Amino acid sequence: MTDDIRYQSLTELDPEVAAAITGELDRQRSTLEMIASENFVPRAVLQAQGSVFTNKYAEGYPGRRYYGGCENADIVEDLARNRAKEVFGAEFANVQPHAGAQANAAVLMALANPGDKIMGLSLAHGGHLTHGMHLNFSGKLYEVAAYEVEPDNFRLDMDKIREQALKEKPQVLIAGWSAYPRHQDFAAFRSIADEVDAKLWVDMAHFAGLVAAGLHPSPVPYADVVSTTVHKTLGGPRSGMILSKQEYAKKLNSAVFPGQQGGPLMHAIVAKAVAMKIAATEEFKDRQQRTLDGAQIIAERLTGADCKAAGVDVLTGGTDVHLVLVDLRNSQMDGQQAEDLLHEVGITVNRNAVPFDPRPPMVTSGLRIGTPALATRGFDAAGFTEVADIIATALAQGAGADTEQLRARVAKLAEQYPLYEGLEDWKLL
């Protein structure tokens, strides 16, 4: 142990914070993370994000910085941009957004003026806060027209969206979602945008990893601009990114800096570069396939006879993506109770509103269950089949579920598919 505070380990300097980190590691290892927007980053991403790039200020862009000493920052940002363009087949990439919300704010700043009309999927029907929710900047700065899913099948009707767009004439048409379990028709959105002379922006934050692996239709050929986070299915650091056609490059760069942000977080950008390298590998493609397969296994199990008898249903009857939306409107449980029940057995999910939900947002009538983190742990068909049965049994039995027995099954899965083996030897603490 040293008296020089600069060289003390975290455990030596701040044991309270170190204990919280150790506690979080134990939680992630011993439970099953099934929040659809969460994932586990590889060791190399952890190392990159904890590197000395934490120290570097680099306002501007490679070759045009407002600070000196940016030669290595330029290298890693160029790597991140070029790798992102290659992975997604895009003409332009900006990797500086701190998060998905900042990326989305920059997109709207580049494509619209305050007071212009934007049209995206309603938050209550699976859209995102930044697509026009009234308390969000997007709902305060822009006029909003929201489209919705159909009440009979909970899917989008592109003919009705076209009719609405012709009536509303938005300046920006938004595709993408945060809770919609089916593919969207990007070609149809492009056609509608062209017909009403709107820009098409696609937010692919949730399904970007599937797109990178070729397992989900890519919005890049159709959209004027595409935004994404780098975590979720991509499995990189928590951050944002923007892709577009080259004609929007200057506006988007200016919208990110100085429009929305000052200096970029270089430690996050170097981690994005690593994540984009991983996204081009065969291992990544295999992981995305297991992510998809796992979601479909869970959806199928949750449509079983025991779940139906308990009033548990799967929205749209299945899934095309990495998440399953569970409809509990006819169940004895609400979303909060179901989330708490699964938490008790060691499975972390989030309660989620369903379209036309009669319950308030903090309670909800649904669950959103995701598979990316388990796929990263190595879950295969057998593992997903077991966790699907645990979830279905818990939801079907409700308050009468044997939580102790179900938790034992979860613990066995956590041991069978270990997380961050040997992390204690990585000297992170």
Swiss-Prot record:
GO molecular function terms attached to this record: glycine hydroxymethyltransferase activity; pyridoxal phosphate binding
Enzyme class: transferase
Localization: Cytoplasm
Residues the entry annotates as binding (6S)-5,6,7,8-tetrahydrofolate: L123, G127, H128, L129
Catalytic activity: (6R)-5,10-methylene-5,6,7,8-tetrahydrofolate + glycine + H2O = (6S)-5,6,7,8-tetrahydrofolate + L-serine
Pathway: One-carbon metabolism; tetrahydrofolate interconversion; Amino-acid biosynthesis; glycine biosynthesis; glycine from L-serine: step 1/1
Presence of the UniProt keyword Transferase in the record: yes
GO biological processes: glycine biosynthetic process from serine; tetrahydrofolate interconversion
Pfam families for this protein: SHMT
Family, similarity comment: Belongs to the SHMT family.
Task of the protein: Catalyzes the reversible interconversion of serine and glycine with tetrahydrofolate (THF) serving as the one-carbon carrier. This reaction serves as the major source of one-carbon groups required for the biosynthesis of purines, thymidylate, methionine, and other important biomolecules. Also exhibits THF-independent aldolase activity toward beta-hydroxyamino acids, producing glycine and aldehydes, via a retro-aldol mechanism.
Quaternary structure and partners: Homodimer.
Protein name: Serine hydroxymethyltransferase
Species the sequence originates in: Corynebacterium diphtheriae (strain ATCC 700971 / NCTC 13129 / Biotype gravis)
Chain's gene name: glyA
